[in-house]
Amino acid sequence: MLKPLGDRVVIEVIETEEKTASGIVLPDTAKEKPQEGRVVAVGKGRVLDSGERVAPEVEVGDRIIFSKYAGTEVKYDGKEYLILRESDILAVIG
C-alpha cells in the first residue's frame, strides 16, 4: 500500500458520469476534471519550524473535495490514485 510522507494524502478519485440537461453523456475529453475523492492513506502530518508535528485533519475513509489541479497522479497495483498535500483539500463531505 502507498504510505504518504509528511502532510500528504493519498486519495482515490470519485468519477461522476456527466450528462447535459438533455441527457447526453459527455465523453472524457469534454468532462470537467474531478474534484471529489475518498482518502485511502494519510501521512503523519506536517512539522512546524519549532519541531512540533501537526496531525492531519482528515482520516482514511473521508470523502473530500480538493482543488481542481492539485496533486500528482500515480498508478499503483493497477489502480489510479492522486497524492496531494492536506492544504489542497477544501472540505470533508458529510
From Swiss-Prot:
UniProt GO BP? chaperone cofactor-dependent protein refolding
According to the UniProt record, one GO cellular component term is: cytoplasm
Listed under subunit, the entry gives: Heptamer of 7 subunits arranged in a ring. Interacts with the chaperonin GroEL.
Induction context: By heat shock.
Where is it mostly found? cytoplasm
Could you tell me what this protein does? Together with the chaperonin GroEL, plays an essential role in assisting protein folding. The GroEL-GroES system forms a nano-cage that allows encapsulation of the non-native substrate proteins and provides a physical environment optimized to promote and accelerate protein folding. GroES binds to the apical surface of the GroEL ring, thereby capping the opening of the GroEL channel.
Any one Gene Ontology MF annotation carried by this entry is:
ATP binding
Q: Where in the cell is it found?
A: Cytoplasm
- Could you tell me the keywords of this UniProt record? Chaperone, Cytoplasm, Stress response
What organism is listed for this UniProt entry?
Geobacillus stearothermophilus (Bacillus stearothermophilus)
Q: Which HAMAP family match?
A: CH10
What protein family does this chain belong to?
Answer: Belongs to the GroES chaperonin family.
Enumerate the NCBIfam families for this protein: PRK00364.1-2 (NF001527), PRK00364.1-6 (NF001530), PRK00364.2-2 (NF001531), PRK00364.2-3 (NF001532), PRK00364.2-4 (NF001533), PRK00364.2-5 (NF001534)
Q: SUPFAM superfamilies from the xrefs?
A: GroES-like
The protein in question is named Co-chaperonin GroES
